[in-house]
Amino acid sequence: MDTLTHALSGALLARATEPKRPRPDQLPRRTRMWIGFIAAAFPDSDFVTRFIDPLTYLTTHRGITHSVIMLPLWTALLALLFTLLVRGKYSWRAFVGVAALGIGIHIAGDVITAFGTMIFAPFSDWRAQFPTTFIIDPYFTAIIVGGLIASSLWNGTRRPAVIGLAVLVAYVGFQAVLHQRALTMGEAYAANHHLDARQVQAIPQPF
């Protein structure tokens, strides 16, 4: 999935999980959403390997920075970095939760695309994938943007952000139904034409 959509999803999740009455030691809304935005974009920092070699990028992209095993380490490092950037105004603990959520939703967003994500790196290069969504999905992005706009208009409650996330989950669920139907059709086609298909796959397409 594109990095901007990842980042926006992190901001929406940060808003949806904001405490109703933040304590003085907790992040204010604007800061919290920016941290969610940045943290959700972080896993794609592996793009720097593109400057080493295109093949290296293809083989390592969605690797160690997208690993659920490494997520605690990346969360801690980001929390420390954010603490330094605000010059200790907030403890690193204030950043941990939203940073973890941001990285987590990025990983989830990549798992639902076809390229696959090495969620167990560096111990395994197996790529998890549940390919329901095209890598750039305007509808997916629009739902997130709609949730953020609604949250800014009705800023007294986190309900619009929660609803936005619920609609997003429902949309992916609908795509999953379509994906399963496509697999069923592919299997039926292979059987009817006496094709020895070892595996049938359905790859999502734009629109």
Annotate the PLM regions.
Residues 1-184, 188-189, 193-204:
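N-terminal membrane-targeting hydrophobic helices
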Residues 207:
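Acidic/histidine-rich
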